[in-house]
Amino acid sequence: MTTTEKVQPRLKERYRNEIRDSLQQQFGYANVMQIPTVTKVVVNMGIGEAARDAKLINGAVNDLALITGQRPEIRRARKSIAQFKLREGMPIGARVTLRGDRMWEFLDRLTSIALPRIRDFRGLSPKQFDGVGNYTFGLAEQSVFHEIDVDKIDRVRGMDINVVTSATTDDEGRALLRALGFPFKEN
């Protein structure tokens, strides 16, 4: 029987070997547990049209599963809204929460492959932090990920990506994500 060594994601290795030390020097943390890290990444795809056609949710679930490597949770309406012809319990979106190695691999693919493939991309807005170091942004189409076959797309779907960090301020979160390779616009 051969023993195989578990390979760490390359972004996680870079964080442990380089980024942690530079953040500790930059902000002068006394304790290594104060150094901010990425806690989780939540990828959400809202499909409002699924209220009228329930088959649309399957395409979104399949796309999210291909992109993240994890089966999405189908989100249902919490209450009925007559103007949107929406009833309580109808499927209206899909969500995936990534943690651990899958999270690091997704962030690596996002920063090195997906974001550079966006047409007319000038960088991410540095103003979309929530006040405690978490970052939220949206992608207009799922085809920027190389896992999605462009010829098999039935409809263009966007998604929201929330990067949750253990940072306590926006400056710490911005420094962490910039070190991880997020291309922020310069003001």
Swiss-Prot record:
GO BP: translation
Keyword terms: Ribonucleoprotein, Ribosomal protein, RNA-binding, rRNA-binding, tRNA-binding
UniProt key word Ribosomal protein: yes
InterPro entries linked: Ribosomal_uL5, Ribosomal_uL5_bac-type, Ribosomal_uL5_C, Ribosomal_uL5_dom_sf, Ribosomal_uL5_N
A cellular component term, taken from the record's GO annotations: ribonucleoprotein complex
Function: This is one of the proteins that bind and probably mediate the attachment of the 5S RNA into the large ribosomal subunit, where it forms part of the central protuberance. In the 70S ribosome it contacts protein S13 of the 30S subunit (bridge B1b), connecting the 2 subunits; this bridge is implicated in subunit movement. Contacts the P site tRNA; the 5S rRNA and some of its associated proteins might help stabilize positioning of ribosome-bound tRNAs.
Family: Belongs to the universal ribosomal protein uL5 family.
Protein name: Large ribosomal subunit protein uL5
Species per Swiss-Prot/TrEMBL record: Mycobacterium avium (strain 104)
